[in-house]
Regions:
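C-terminal motif of bacterial Sec signal peptides marking the signal peptidase cleavage site
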Residues: 18-20
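Structural signature of WD-repeat beta-propellers
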Residues: 82-83, 121-122, 161-162, 206-207
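Short loop/turn segments that connect beta-strands within beta-propeller blades
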Residues: 91-94, 130-133, 170-173
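Beta-propeller domains
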Residues: 82-93
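Conserved beta-propeller blade signature
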Residues: 77-79, 117-118, 157-158, 202-203
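Extracytoplasmic beta-rich repeat domains
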Residues: 24-27, 34-40, 47-72, 97-114, ...
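Bacterial N-terminal signal peptides that target proteins for export
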Residues: 2-10
Length: 212
């Protein structure tokens, strides 16, 4: 008799478990073949839309295939450079070109601020020109390829080379004021992260994974 009761109890428990699982779709371990999990969801329609008005546009003949030549903004002007050595100043309001110069082939650019526009050429020269007319102010060879934008403040221009060296150049004449060299790992890819100056402190990430 006890055996019969136990069998009935087991059957009832089994029925309860099966019925519970069938009503809980989220706990099912199988899915219908009609549902494709990789199918993208339907896009939501947005009613709050605005049209973009183009105030002006300009074009440049140089290329920027690896993204090392982002423009910069300073004193109501935009500054551009490219790998061919073209450096230009554009009025941000009108799109009119203020000036254009040609330098040696460049490795990176463009940083602007405190009256300077700074780029770096393929021979390791950091070149500063005047924001107002593009005249060359100074050039300093840092003995290493510079693939990242420099950082500029009122006193110093901070440069990071591909060999892991960080240098501070005098903003007025380009003289090397100080330098710091990080230890590169045995296997590394040429780094291109840019230094940042905040409250007289320089922040930079090195190829060995350290943040200084």
């Amino acid at each position: 008799m006890k055996s019969f009761k136990y069998k009935n109890l087991i059957v009832l428990c089994s029925i309860f478990i099966i019925s519970s699982c069938s009503s809980m779709d989220g706990l099912r371990f199988w899915k219908s073949d009609e549902i494709d999990p990789d199918e993208p969801k339907e896009l939501v329609a947005f009613s709050n839309q605005k049209n973009i008005v183009i105030e002006w546009k300009n074009s440049f003949k140089g290329e920027n295939e690896i993204g090392n030549f982002l423009p910069d903004f300073s004193a109501q002007n935009l500054f551009f450079s490219d790998a061919s050595g073209n450096v230009s100043s554009i009025n941000a309001s009108t799109g009119d070109r203020n000036w254009s110069i040609e330098l040696n082939f460049l490795a990176s650019g463009t940083s602007a601020g405190f009256g300077l526009v700074v780029v770096s050429d393929i021979d390791g020269n950091v070149i500063a020109v005047d924001q107002n007319d593009g005249s060359k102010l100074w050039s300093t060879n840092v003995k290493g390829e510079v693939l990242s934008k420099v950082a500029i403040d009122a006193k110093v221009v901070v440069v990071k080379t591909g060999s892991g060296e960080l240098l501070g150049l005098d903003r007025e004449n380009g003289e090397i004021l100080w330098s710091y060299r990080s230890k590169l790992p045995l296997l590394t890819v040429r780094g291109s992260s840019s230094p940042v100056i905040v409250d007289d402190l320089v922040y930079v990430s090195f190829d060995n994974g350290r943040l200084g």
